[in-house]
Amino acid sequence: MSDTPKPPSNTLSLKRETATEAPKLEERLHKVLAQAGLGSRRALEQRISNGLIKVNGDIAQLGMSVKSGDKIELDGRSFVASALTEPARVLIYNKPEGEVTTREDPEGRPTVFETLPVLKGARWIAIGRLDINTTGLLLLTTDGELANAMMHPSSEIEREYVVRVRSPEGEEHVQDELLEQLTRGVMLEDGTAKFDTIERIGNTDSHDWFRVVVKEGRNREVRRLWESQGCQVSRLKRTRYGSVLLPRELLRGQSTELPKTQVEALRTQLKLEKDMPLALTLQPIIGQRRSAKATLHVNRNDNNKHAYHNNHSTADESRELRRFDTLRDDRGRGQGKHHFKDRLTVSGEAAAKQAHKPFKQYKPKNDRSLSEGSPATFQSWYVPEGVSTGPRNHRNAGAGNGAHPNKKSPNPNTRNTPGQQTRKSPYKYPNNAPNFPSDHATPTFNPYGNPGQKTGAGRPNNSGGKYNRNRGPRYP
């Protein structure tokens, strides 16, 4: 035997070599929630202070940080903090009048988020806001870090607007002295504000058109600057945000996505690092269900002894089990077409809606015995006991009075004619009608008619043959 060691065999194993784990990303809780698009940072901080958010099972505190992998509970749903690995996306939206830049409006007005493309695992974050009467360029992104960098005043990103202004009272047009005042600066309620650039681009008999540029995103800043000088803004439209221009071919209410090259150029301009997950976001836990409404079951007949409370809905269970339902008709084992009456004919969801309904109780049937004096009690006088009258339609079986009025009666004088169907006779004698004892009192009377004789001529004398049965007594 040689002493050379054998080469190690390639065995299958599920274990992997321990790799150096990257440091976990850590960020403030309200920042992570805002990155996921669950609201503004100020509103989320208020919810954290109210104790409405939990982190790893404990109530979150204001100012705390979370790491990737932490479990966050909000509004009855669970999320996991994870690094944002997907590339940032930027959307250009041409906002029309009448829409507000918010996710939910308490007054029920339409919002810009109702017409945007649907995302999975992320939400659109508006870069700045436009009031309900302002139209034009509105940028939205999935990168919260990019949105904050573009909105922060320290970035000094230009916002360009086209505005139509009505001059102050007593003047036909806006004077140049007023424009110089707006470029130097005007004191507003929240501090000094100014236009970085003002350019006159046209005028009419009652209005003047200007192109203005600001580097801040205060609330209604452009309108308040003009109103401070006695002017009235009748139309306002944003045409540029930083290096992004509003496309001329983009109609109002439509959106288009910014190319990835321009998105990377924006990040480079704002000095944001490349290929680094600089933000945490929330990913929903797969397989979780929304908490169903609790139901209370009370049995009134048992004085609430068997009442119970559960935290699930039968309708939800039936909806999940409905895929296993097999709708079929159960037949009996014997011959014939006898089916069970209580076969499954509805879906599980429909059955769950009727689960708490009581069974239908039928009242006992009343006694249907005939009262005295009823004409039906005299049936024994018309038909004596022991006499069989045959089926119900025997009185209508004669010639000319068929049970089916639409069918023609066969000719009684012709029998077994080739090509003609022979009429069935239940009693197998010529007139297809029985003889009653009451008919014997008047032998010349035939209540069923005789096509061979006139009325009152008596019965035909069939003195033999197979029709000589059940003729009754003979008369001289």
From Swiss-Prot:
Q: Where is the composition biased (Polar residues)?
A: 371-380, 408-424
Q: Give me the stretches of Basic residues compositional bias.
A: 354-363
Q: Where is the composition biased (Basic and acidic residues)?
A: 314-333
| UniProt-recorded Gene Ontology molecular function terms | 23S rRNA pseudouridine(2605) synthase activity; RNA binding
Its Enzyme Commission number(s) read 5.4.99.22
- The UniProt annotation puts the region (Disordered) at 299-476
Q: Which terms are listed as keywords in the entry?
A: Isomerase, RNA-binding, rRNA processing
Q: Which GO terms describe its biological process?
A: enzyme-directed rRNA pseudouridine synthesis
Highest taxon of the lineage: Bacteria
The kind of enzyme this is, by top-level EC class, is: isomerase
What positions does the domain S4 RNA-binding occupy?
27-96
Q: Does the keyword RNA-binding apply?
A: yes
What residue ranges carry the coiled-coil annotation? none
**Catalytic positions?**
131 (nucleophile)
Magnesium among the record's keywords? Answer: no
Reaction equation(s) it catalyzes? uridine(2605) in 23S rRNA = pseudouridine(2605) in 23S rRNA
| Role description | Responsible for synthesis of pseudouridine from uracil-2605 in 23S ribosomal RNA.
The family note in this entry says: Belongs to the pseudouridine synthase RsuA family.
Q: What is this protein called?
A: Ribosomal large subunit pseudouridine synthase B
Organism of derivation: Xylella fastidiosa (strain 9a5c)
